[in-house]
């Protein structure tokens, strides 16, 4: 991990995910409840292999980036983007360990991810979330006040500019 905001003992820091962070990412998976996994992957995920951990570790810090929240060298949250091939648009996703939710980590990670995306030439984020996932809907509405969401079959879709 490459520190963005250093963490003091017992406090949360932010870092860029590295391919070598696989063991920590796998441990995060086992900290997530079935509901949190479903919210993140939009389908039931029972084993880490179903979440395609190698794909989740595939970061190049340009087209694919991930910011992690870290406490005592353990990952407790991940915010990532993946740029669409040949585009300046990237899809984003965020997950926070259940015991760390509602403490501002998603906001901090989204802010850092937004800054990274801006510096790498990403011009817009696309996102999909379950319509009843109120914490995530509220997060995006707070962070992107101009957000317009479309509703289809229980999902919300949105596109927001990265340049603010």
List PLM regions with ranges.
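Long, contiguous binding/interaction regions
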Residues: 1-164
